[in-house]
Amino acid sequence: MELHQWCRHIIVFLLNVWIPSCFAQTTPPARSSPTPTPQTADNPDSLKFRLSGFPRKHNEGRIEVFYKGEWGTICDDDFSLANAHVLCRQLGFVSATGWTHSAKYGKGAGKIWLDNVQCSGSERSVSVCKSRGWGNSDCTHDEDAGVICKDERLPGFVDSNVIEVQVDENRVEEVRLRPVFTTATKRMPVTEGVVEVKNKDGWAQICDIGWTPKNTHVVCGMMGFPHEKKVNKNFYKLYAERQKNFFLVHSVACLGTEVHLAACPLEFNYGNATESCPGGMPAVVSCVPGPLYTQSPTMKKKLKMPPTTRLKGGAKYGEGRVEVLKGSEWGTVCDDRWNLVSASVVCREMGFGSAKEALTGASMGKGLGPIHMNEVQCTGNERSLWSCRYKNITAEDCKHTEDASVRCNVPYMGYEKTVRILGGRTRYEGRVEVLHREADGTLRWGLICGEGWGTQEAMVLCRQLGLGYANHGLQVRLSGGRSPYEGRVEVRVGQRWGSVCSEGWSTKEAMVLCRQLGLGFSMHAITETWYWDSSNVTDMVMSGVKCTGDEMSISQCQHHRTVNCQKAAARFAAGVICSETASDLVLNAPLVQQTTYIEDRPLHMLYCAAEEDCLSKSAASANWPYGHRRLLRFSSQIHNIGRADFRPKAGRHSWVWHACHGHYHSMDIFTHYDLMSANGTKVAEGHKASFCLEDTDCDEGVSKRYKCANFGEQGITVGCWDLYRHDIDCQWIDITDVKPGNYILQVVINPNYEVSESDFTNNAMKCNCKYDGHRIWVHNCHIGDAFSEEAEKKFEKYPGQLNNQIS
């Protein structure tokens, strides 16, 4: 009995313990909405961290954590600068300057150790920050986070784990081709040579034992070349036997889809590097340049082939917003899952090398029209982006704020060494100087005559300098500017620098110059540079410069064989101001088609228009105030989809007051309205004398900045548009004298290139018109570069529909 009673007490005790514990258990949080909690590793000090990925510097990269014997990544969900601060300190840096998402440094492999990490920034270790917990994640490696640390080490930091995991990748951050032939050293670009990698002791070679075409493919891509070819190793073998080589890398095993040699499996030499390639020699590659960089007739023919992919809105060759052709219509690519592998397919398809950057968020400006592709996933072996896996777009998937862009590796041409700008306030502006070779072979710098120097010339020069928008042997520089982006243009002739005559110097020339110097776009083409402090350059060595705006270098533009400058004084030397960003104006074509109509307007209502000279010449002989004029009216809505505000070239002091309109006009010629015959002959034109520029309305979240009223600032803000309604004065073409027939309505924005833009090819809009003397049919309105060349040729043949009647 006592035993039975004792057992009963035991059972009651166990039930009292077990039942409350069951009811105390809670349901775990749903996967889609985690509740981060602090997750502490067994020993936070035992965690190891490293920076990986490519291309990158030593203080940035994909963050990886070594936990429970395995390296893994961190998901970018809820990632912040505070997280980056904690991680950078654990890596031995004083703090973070930024962080990256969407696997900017490439996708990692293996585990994703942490997700939804939320640090305050003061934690000693990321392991004590809130998160889902170790190994608990709903991410893919497309979402790997990266950090950018301040390049300053913590005093006394001695964690060898961090240093050791960075050593190998740091050694191959720079790669070059060293040409061996004497003639090859003078020819640009260098397409063949010994592969060398840079380390702390200088440049070293790679042993070619086991070297494969896939390795060559990766190296050529880094050098800016889309393809490779076999190389004659016999010559190089003889050369190598006479040289003392230093072999840093013993073995390379690329897959061929990598964008950087650092991403390939590498074996390094740690012994006697001069004798560590028995039976081998330095690796040698031979690359095939794209059509833009070759003299080969076969490759040049490829330039004339209709493209299916193009880059728009970039300041330099090899960068821009990705656009693809589908059903004769150009459209953009959504940036979902956009990465370096897919970007490299685009770059090689365009005739460049592998991708340096896969940019998201409309980094090169927003596109127009349809978005053709979403979630593009390439393997890296495709010849065209259309060969990659992708999803068709739906209205809910993407907007043009998510347009994908690329920056490609391009061949080094040395153009930026042949031009300079001096005297400007920044490196983006200055007087233009060029380096020129005289008849005796000597080199000297000189000025460029500023007569006719305009925005187009300046855009060419800014691209040459690498400063953005605005022949190899002609050296150019900017002199005297307030910054590296401005200055007087100077060229070198023999051993002497000289200036450029500013007669004819315009936006197109400045575009090329800024591009050549790598300074972006041209903001202004300057024709008088007396206010910029001069270098010792006094000679004018170049005049008559005329560019199309597409050249890589100012030497590829037309110019006088001998200097012929009417204004040869130094004050008239050409100059530029370059900028990293530019505006991009485009007309709302559907709105033109929807609002076009004919009005017979009585002359007594057109006195103000006559004062503005908005009627055709025959109006002067009309029987005023009796009779009427027949007007083709329409609305024009001009959007700025670029990356900088569109501002009038003229300062406020030169704006003109228009009493009829009650405000100032800041631009004499802002748009051209033309009615043309099918063969392009102009039969009537708009006579709008001048324009004011303002923000009529803007995209959601964008504030208006410019207004025509009073004497305020004028312009068009990025993300805003200027609307000229069909019912305002002079918003028409006077077609009183036009006979019935088939015509083309054309509207061109910024026709004289007075203001720099990132893309001038989308400034023209065309419509088909059929006029029977009483009614007009307007159809097929589109931006000039919206369709393929083949579709554009069929432009006049499309049938129209009745659009309106005379009002």
Curated annotation (Swiss-Prot):
Compartments where located: Secreted, Extracellular space; Cytoplasm; Nucleus
Domain SRCR: 49-150, 175-288, 309-409, 419-470, 476-579
PROSITE patterns (UniProt xref): LYSYL_OXIDASE, SRCR_1, SRCR_2
Pfam families cross-referenced by the UniProt entry: Lysyl_oxidase, SRCR
EC number(s) from the headed UniProt entry: 1.4.3.-, 1.4.3.13
GO MF annotations in UniProt: copper ion binding; fibronectin binding; protein-lysine 6-oxidase activity
Cross-link (Lysine tyrosylquinone (Lys-Tyr)): 688-724
Gene ablation phenotype (knockout): Craniofacial defects. Cartilage elements embryos do not mature and chondrocyte morphology and extracellular matrix are affected.
Record GO cellular component, one term: collagen-containing extracellular matrix
UniProt-listed InterPro entries: LOX-like_protein, Lysyl_oxidase, Lysyl_oxidase_CS, SRCR, SRCR-like_dom_sf
Reactions performed catalytically: L-lysyl-[protein] + O2 + H2O = (S)-2-amino-6-oxohexanoyl-[protein] + H2O2 + NH4(+); N(6)-acetyl-L-lysyl-[protein] + O2 + H2O = acetamide + (S)-2-amino-6-oxohexanoyl-[protein] + H2O2
Entry coiled-coil feature ranges: none
GO biological process: collagen fibril organization; embryonic viscerocranium morphogenesis; fibronectin fibril organization; inflammatory response; lung development; negative regulation of T-helper 17 cell lineage commitment; peptidyl-lysine oxidation; positive regulation of integrin-mediated signaling pathway
Extent of the signal sequence: 1-24
Function: Protein-lysine 6-oxidase that mediates the oxidation of peptidyl lysine residues to allysine in target proteins. Catalyzes the post-translational oxidative deamination of peptidyl lysine residues in precursors of elastin and different types of collagens, a prerequisite in the formation of cross-links between collagens and elastin. Can mediate oxidation of lysine residues that are acetylated. Also able to catalyze deacetylation of lysine residues. Required for maturation of neural crest derived cartilage elements.
PANTHER family in UniProt: LYSYL OXIDASE HOMOLOG 3, LYSYL OXIDASE-LIKE-RELATED
Protein's recorded name: Lysyl oxidase homolog 3B
Lineage: Eukaryota, Metazoa, Chordata, Craniata, Vertebrata
